[in-house]
Every structure is written in C-alpha cells, then in structure tokens.
Regions:
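Sec/Tat signal peptide C-region and signal peptidase I cleavage site
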Residues: 23-27
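Bacterial N-terminal signal peptides
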Residues: 12-21
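Secreted/periplasmic proteins
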Residues: 28-273
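Bacterial N-terminal signal peptides that target proteins for export
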Residues: 4-12
Length: 273
C-alpha cells in the first residue's frame, strides 16, 4: 500500500484519538512485544537472564560534557563520528521529538532507540580485550577480527512498569567500562554514582517507556534478533537490520497498517454501542 494511504490511516487514527482519547488501540494485539517481562509467567526460559531493579540514567547523541560527566557524546566508544553518522543532535526535549520517538528536525540515520552498558570489548580499534572471549555469550559465533566490537549494535530489551522497549547497544557506560561481572553475569553494577546506575537510556527509550523523575529503576536483558517484536525501534537506522532489509521494512509497514485498521475498527465498535 502507498505511503499516502498510510498517512490517511494515521490521520484518521489521530482524529479518533482526539474524539476519544481513552480508546484502546490494540486489544489483545499479536504485534505487542512478546519479550518476557521478569514478572510474567513463562512457557520457556529466555536465552539471557534479566538484570532486575537497575537504576537507569539518560544520555543522547551530541550531549555536551558536564561537571559530573566530562565526556561528550559527539563520539561513542565504538564510533568516532557518532553524531555525524546519527545525522545530528538527538534533542532530548520531548517538545522537540515526534510521535515515533525521533528528533523532529531530521530523520536519524542510526536507530534512535539505543542504550549504553558498562563494558567495552575493545582495547582499541586494533585489539580486542582478552576477557571478551571468556565472558560474552555470543562471542564465538559473531567475532570477525581483532578490534571489531561484537557488542556494538546488540539488541537489548528493557522492562519498566509492565511495558517493554527494545533498543541497540551503542555506547559504553554509565561510569564504568569493564564491568563484565554485571553486564554478562549476576553481579550488581560496580558504579557507585547515581544510585549504582547500570544502564544509560536514549530519549526514545525514555519516552516510549514513560520514565520520568527519580522513578527510574528498570529491568533489562539481551535479546536475539529473532525475539525483537514489532515497534518503533524497527523503523530507523542503517545499523538496524529491520530498517535496512527490504523484507523487514515491508513487514513493518504492513504491521503498522494492520494496527491502524484495528484501532479504527475498535473505535467504530465502541461508537455503535
């Protein structure tokens, strides 16, 4: 279906929401995230364990250094031109962001759903840490050459108050760079600052989950590509397999159309009662 048709459906949905903001968009929708939350009953064990009750902090591409955080985010631990490759400044102000959780001024070239975790598998661009081979579960099946990260771009699921968001690992932090016992094991975060912060979340992740103020403890775990459900984290980025592969792009559009149709039908049913 054409982009014009999708835009008409979106406009119809917006009008419906303005008329009745309490509408449930997708009741029992199969497209909702299926990644297991730590409090849900499971029919199978997830491939990676949950890290529970972890303090989250926030960061963004292009963030300037501060007294508490002297490192700028124009570059990441794995991308010396992160801001340029992203396409610009990932403005964290919610007023300057769109409904699909991206910065309003441009379409990002990389996935706006990103996180940082406190482990770097590289010493530099020519050498991989010795510990990486020992502690990273997927190392043997993804390693290509010395100095090339096997962590960069890895998918993560974040759970907050019953809602799950997916994002890609894009940088190292907060505060630590070698906390493998926490990132890949069962230990608590080594960092003492910010209430033992153990994960950095991008503005897109923050806004999707609705994290505000000091109520910022979440759960997270690694996820395989095959586990990643439909969601806004599939839409953007040349580093995103769902956005860069035609079959995933097509499937994402079809899912979006189906969700909009279901929302319209749900509203019509409610209106006829």
């Amino acid at each position: 279906m054409s982009d014009q048709f999708i835009m008409k459906l979106r406009l119809s949905l917006i009008i419906l929401l303005l008329i009745n903001p309490t509408i449930l968009l997708v009741e029992g929708n199969d497209n909702l995230p299926k990644t297991y939350a730590p409090t849900q009953s499971r029919t199978k064990t997830p491939p990676y364990p949950w890290h529970r009750n972890i303090t989250a902090t926030f960061f963004w591409v292009g963030e300037s250094p501060t007294a508490r955080n002297p490192t700028h985010n124009r570059a990441s631990s794995w991308d010396t031109e992160w801001m340029k490759n992203f396409g610009g400044y990932d403005d964290p102000n919610p007023a300057n962001r769109t409904r699909d959780f991206r910065p309003r001024k441009f379409i990002p070239k990389l996935n706006p759903f990103y996180v940082a975790l406190p482990y770097n598998d590289r010493i530099n661009y020519k050498k991989t840490k010795a510990s990486a081979r020992r502690v990273i579960p997927w190392f043997n099946r993804t390693f290509k050459k010395e100095g090339q990260s096997v962590c960069h771009g890895r998918w993560v699921a974040i759970h907050y108050k019953g809602k799950i968001c997916c994002a890609q690992w894009a940088d190292v932090g907060p505060f630590e760079t070698d906390d493998w016992a926490y990132v890949f094991g069962n230990s608590r975060p080594k960092a003492k600052s910010n209430n033992n912060a153990g994960i950095d979340l991008s503005p897109a992740v923050r806004d999707y989950l609705g994290i505000t103020g000091s109520d910022n403890r979440c759960d997270w775990r690694f996820a395989e590509v095959t586990e990643i459900p439909y969601g806004p984290w599939r839409k953007f980025g040349k580093d995103n397999p769902f956005a860069s592969m035609p079959r995933y792009v097509d499937k994402t559009k079809k899912n979006e159309i189906e969700i909009l149709k279901q929302a319209r039908e749900a509203w019509l049913r409610r209106a006829q009662r």
